[in-house]
């Protein structure tokens, strides 16, 4: 295979700018998929992706155009899946930057461009949706030059929906995307694992980009991140390329993107970003991997039925295979039993995983309220990281608490600037800068505590700006905050699943909300139940679940009032005794409804 005929590129764009539709048109025009077989969002293989209209997983396909071989790697566009994008870019030489002609540059476009520049990729600007009446191509071109600094004289104007301009785009890929000319089949094998997925019959299937060397069926290989021994020896059973369905081959050459099956059964044996090499002629050094991504949102996952605990563990193992950004460990809760503490890249990421567990693995779960990882400085000089409110050390042993902060960049129409600033202030934001992009839009930068943005910030921002704002963030480190742990007591008993960590100024507000929610959800008992929120033993909010009362005076008619009072007194004493020994059963539905995040409640409306 001639190396100068290989063109490997990724498609990057903000969510909803037409990335998957353009991928469909490219598949159609290169005759990779016939029009009859082509469905919308063809490369989005998960049902969930098609339903929500978003890409979640990356996908890699080999196509033929004239006498060239195109290797297209489709990427997600949502801020939570930036890690998937960075992996695709590390396996590419070029990137198509898609910008919606009606919306212009959005926050996520910018984030992905910086990733492409970091990876030293050739970027081709593509202006999509030019057929729409509201398209303003000249303004968007100007914006690309001003904000990103890429010349737009070679920008391609297309309509992914109708197919207009896509043929010009294919020629531009041939002209501008570099070929892997340094790829050499004779050098020792170096192949980058940029993704993996689980097949119930073949085990783990690796998606690789061969940078140097050649890989054949029957070859023995190893992972370079681990020492070579018996447990790090694998045989290639099958390999091939995707176009878009799997096509088997006898070998893969340098420069190619393909898949490899080697009867790998354990998900933990693989880390995405690793390099594979031959055992008999190993490479001297591994390829530069990816910077390890850190989970930022943590939540407890507990099976609804305790019998499903093992199944939940196996499902998490399988999902972590294709999504190496998830971290999880076992934990227990007095109220919910055995479960796992799971770390995610963001709330959408968490929601998607919950749905995947339910659909693909048939495991129903209760998720506790999401939280972030706090840095606790103790009086004895120790530093502890805590993501679970129940693990918070005693207040008397804490010197100070720091929480993670993000730098949020928001692109917004000028008329909504006031609304957005008001929202950021209410979330304890620190104003950094405001920059006008043109006479219609501006870029605002704020520093915000991550804990304030993980619940409802995104939804509120959309409603404050009628859906026109776009948001992108990066972690900038930890800052000291005045944080407290709020515990919930039911009938004087602490319920660990409802504990939260909140800022002192907002603790009362959160505690009050939670008490009211609990009062509405927990069924009435035969005795009165106090629902209390406490900070370090001090009660800050209270609600009461009223008791059922039997009408003990029904059998009386007439007579002295003292007879009535005597019976009521007797009932009161009985209830008091019952309250002392009565334990409260919190039904499963109550847990589910109380612990549901705002997104779930919004969907219910």
UniProtKB/Swiss-Prot annotation:
Keywords: Cell membrane, GTP-binding, Hydrolase, Membrane, Nucleotide-binding, Protein biosynthesis. It is a peripheral membrane protein. Coiled coil: none annotated. Residues 4-181 form the tr-type G domain. GO terms for biological process: positive regulation of translation. The keyword Ribonucleoprotein does not apply. It catalyses: GTP + H2O = GDP + phosphate + H(+). InterPro entries: EF-4, EFG_III/V, EFG_V-like, EFTu-like_2, G_TR_CS, LepA_C_sf, LepA_CTD, LepA_IV. GO terms for molecular function: GTP binding; GTPase activity; ribosome binding; translation elongation factor activity. It holds the Pfam family EFG_C. It is an enzyme of class 3 (hydrolase). GO terms for cellular component: plasma membrane. The keyword Secreted does not apply. Its EC number is 3.6.5.n1. Required for accurate and efficient protein synthesis under certain stress conditions. May act as a fidelity factor of the translation reaction, by catalyzing a one-codon backward translocation of tRNAs on improperly translocated ribosomes. Back-translocation proceeds from a post-translocation (POST) complex to a pre-translocation (PRE) complex, thus giving elongation factor G a second chance to translocate the tRNAs correctly. Binds to ribosomes in a GTP-dependent manner. Belongs to the TRAFAC class translation factor GTPase superfamily. Classic translation factor GTPase family. LepA subfamily. This is Elongation factor 4.
């Amino acid at each position: 295979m001639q190396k100068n005929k290989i063109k490997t590129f990724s498609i990057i764009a903000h969510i909803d700018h037409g990335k998957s539709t353009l991928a469909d048109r490219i598949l159609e025009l290169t005759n990779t998929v016939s029009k009859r077989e082509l469905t919308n969002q063809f490369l989005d293989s998960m049902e969930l992706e098609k339903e929500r209209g978003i890409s979640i997983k990356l996908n890699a396909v080999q196509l033929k155009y004239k006498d060239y071989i195109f290797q297209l790697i489709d990427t997600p566009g949502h801020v939570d899946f930036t890690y998937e994008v960075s992996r695709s870019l590390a396996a590419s030489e070029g990137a198509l930057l898609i910008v919606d002609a009606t919306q212009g540059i959005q926050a996520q476009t910018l984030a992905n461009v910086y990733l492409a520049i970091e990876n030293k990729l050739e970027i081709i600007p593509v202006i999509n949706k030019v057929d729409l009446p509201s398209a303003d191509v000249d303004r968007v071109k100007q914006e690309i030059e001003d904000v990103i600094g890429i010349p737009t004289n070679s920008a391609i104007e297309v309509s992914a929906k109708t197919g207009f301009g896509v043929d010009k785009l294919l020629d531009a890929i041939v002209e501008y995307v570099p070929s892997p000319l340094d790829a050499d089949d004779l050098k020792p094998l170096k192949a980058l694992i940029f993704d993996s997925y689980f097949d119930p019959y073949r085990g783990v299937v690796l998606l690789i980009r061969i940078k140097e060397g050649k890989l054949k069926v029957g070859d023995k290989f190893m992972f370079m991140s681990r020492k070579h021994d018996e447990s790090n020896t694998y045989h290639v059973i099958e390999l091939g390329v995707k176009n878009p369905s799997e096509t088997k081959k006898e070998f893969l050459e340098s420069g190619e993107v393909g898949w490899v099956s080697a009867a790998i059964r354990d998900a933990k044996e693989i880390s995405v970003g690793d390099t594979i090499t031959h055992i008999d002629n190993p490479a001297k050094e591994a390829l530069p991997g990816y910077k390890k991504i850190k989970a930022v949102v943590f939540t407890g996952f507990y099976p609804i039925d305790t019998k499903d605990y093992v199944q939940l563990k196996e499902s998490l193992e399988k999902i972590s295979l294709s999504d190496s950004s998830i971290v999880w460990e076992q934990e227990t809760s007095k109220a919910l039993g055995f479960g796992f503490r799971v770390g995610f890249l963001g709330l959408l990421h968490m929601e998607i995983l919950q749905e995947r567990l339910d659909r693909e693995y048939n495991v129903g779960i209760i998720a506790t309220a999401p939280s972030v990882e706090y840095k606790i400085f103790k009086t004895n000089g120790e530093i502890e990281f805590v993501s679970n409110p129940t693990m918070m050390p005693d207040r008397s042993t804490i010197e100070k608490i720091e929480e993670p902060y993000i730098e949020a960049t928001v692109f917004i129409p000028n008329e909504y600037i006031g609304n957005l600033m008001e929202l950021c202030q209410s979330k304890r934001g620190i104003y950094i800068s405001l920059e006008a992009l043109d006479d219609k839009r501006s870029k605002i930068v704020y520093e915000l505590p991550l804990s304030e943005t993980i619940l409802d910030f995104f939804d509120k921002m959309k409603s404050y700006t009628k859906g026109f704002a776009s948001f992108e963030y990066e972690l900038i480190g930890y800052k000291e905050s005045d944080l407290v742990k709020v515990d919930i007591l039911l009938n004087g008993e602490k319920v660990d699943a409802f504990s939260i960590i909140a800022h002192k100024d907002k603790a009362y507000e959160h505690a009050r909300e939670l008490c009211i929610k609990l009062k509405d959800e927990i069924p009435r008992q035969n005795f009165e139940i106090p629902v209390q929120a406490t900070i370090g033993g001090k009660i800050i909010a209270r609600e009461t679940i009223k008791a059922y009362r039997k009408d003990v005076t029904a059998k009386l008619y007439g007579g002295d009032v003292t007879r009535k009072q005597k019976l009521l007194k007797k009932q009161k004493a009985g209830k008091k005794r019952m309250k002392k020994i009565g334990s409260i059963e919190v039904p499963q539905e109550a847990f589910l409804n109380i612990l549901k995040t705002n997104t779930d409640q919004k969907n219910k409306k």
